[in-house]
């Protein structure tokens, strides 16, 4: 495996590919000579490459790309054209058009294209999926997600493109359906061209919706999702290492007054709270192992190019709504909007 990018995320990929029994890091590429030299001291077995072109001369089976999103299409296209399987950091590409191009190229070359949506391989998210699939919560009413912190500011994308891919990929994986439309509002304080605070609302129809709050300006770090159902509700607090998931037997019961269509009796139910046992494990290790297994077995990745494309479509629609001050965007229109700045 070759890894392109040794900045923030690349070293994590290199560490996990090195630990995986089915992979070996044979090459590392980065344009920063000092950074490349430093990572090379930790992984002397890997050939150090100053460019992607130099890396493509090394015998490889696959490449992982951990570079800014604006470079994903060019780098992934070059690797797929060279006959390599590709794992690319989220989001898949900077536009719907670029994402569609990569999905088509991977299919044409018959190569695995996988997006590193790490949460889909985390034990808490897998546990939530089991709970939802078993009907523990009843009919899902709404999902609230808060993903806020002070930073880290990105130079090439806004806060929606930086943080919302986590939530959008989680919703895609857990719900198995796409929203009918979305709206987004936000503003940029550090830069007028990049929103650093944003709110995204997704309408799934049948009185189901999801609300996402993403923020680079919060004094507090919060990583929390609430799944509210007709029977029970679930809270996922990523920062709670011991009990990240809590299921609440709390809710309401509505008894319509038969004498008037305008009157209803609302009752409140308070029951037990329980937390499933979640085995601690590094999700990124599961990502690289899954990538290797898909290559060896010819299988479709859990977070394949199609899922990555669906996420990019939603991001593009959110940008369209942001640029129009929160107008609701049907997703067939949002898919056509392909600028990743707002």
For each of these PLM feature ranges, what is it?
Residues 150-220, 226, 240, 306:
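Rossmann-like dinucleotide-binding domain that binds NAD(P)(H)
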Residues 93-155:
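A contiguous active-site-proximal alpha/beta segment in oxidoreductase catalytic domains
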Residues 20, 118, 231-302, 327-331, ...:
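C-terminal glycine/acidic-rich active-site capping loop/insertion
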Residues 83, 110, 135, 207, ...:
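Glycine-centered short loops/turns at secondary-structure junctions
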Residues 13, 43-104:
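Beta-loop-alpha module in the N-terminal Rossmann-like domain of NAD(P)-dependent dehydrogenases
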Residues 27, 62, 142:
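Short, Asp-centered acidic motifs that coordinate Mg2+ and/or phosphate
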Residues 24-27, 293-311:
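Glycine- and charged-residue-rich phosphate/anionic-cofactor binding loop of Rossmann-like
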Residues 1-43:
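N-terminal Rossmann-like dinucleotide-binding module
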């Amino acid at each position: 495996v070759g890894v392109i990018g040794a900045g923030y995320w690349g070293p994590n990929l290199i560490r996990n590919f090195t630990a995986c029994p089915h992979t070996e890091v044979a090459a590392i590429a980065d344009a920063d000579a000092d950074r490349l030299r430093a990572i090379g001291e930790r992984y002397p077995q890997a050939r150090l490459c100053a460019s992607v072109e130099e890396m493509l001369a090394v015998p490889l089976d696959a490449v992982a790309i951990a570079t800014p999103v604006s470079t994903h299409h060019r780098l992934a296209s070059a690797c797929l054209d060279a006959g390599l399987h590709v794992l690319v950091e989220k989001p898949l590409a900077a536009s719907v058009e670029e994402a569609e191009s990569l999905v088509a190229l991977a299919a044409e070359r018959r190569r695995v294209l996988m997006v590193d949506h790490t949460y889909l391989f985390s034990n808490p998210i897998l546990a939530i999926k089991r709970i939802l699939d078993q009907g523990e919560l009843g009919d899902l009413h709404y999902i609230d997600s808060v993903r806020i912190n002070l930073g880290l500011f990105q130079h090439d994308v806004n806060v929606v493109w930086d943080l919302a891919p986590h939530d959008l990929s989680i919703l895609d994986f857990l719900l198995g359906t796409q929203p009918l439309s979305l709206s987004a509002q936000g503003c940029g304080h550090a830069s007028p061209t990049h929103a650093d605070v944003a709110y995204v609302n997704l309408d799934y129809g049948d009185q189901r919706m999801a609300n996402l709050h993403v923020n680079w300006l919060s004094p507090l770090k919060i990583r929390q999702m609430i799944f509210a159902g007709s029977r029970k509700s679930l809270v996922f607090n990523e920062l709670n290492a011991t009990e990240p998931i809590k299921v609440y037997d709390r809710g309401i019961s509505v008894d319509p007054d038969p004498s008037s269509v305008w009157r209803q009796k609302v009752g409140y139910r308070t029951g037990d709270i329980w937390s499933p046992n979640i085995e601690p494990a590094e999700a990124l290790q599961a990502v690289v192992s899954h990538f290797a297994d898909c290559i060896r077995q010819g299988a479709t990745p859990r977070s394949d190019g199609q899922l990555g494309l669906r996420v990019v479509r939603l991001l593009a629609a959110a940008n369209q709504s942001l640029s129009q001050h929160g107008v609701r965007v049907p997703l067939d229109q949002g898919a056509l909007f392909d600028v990743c700045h707002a």
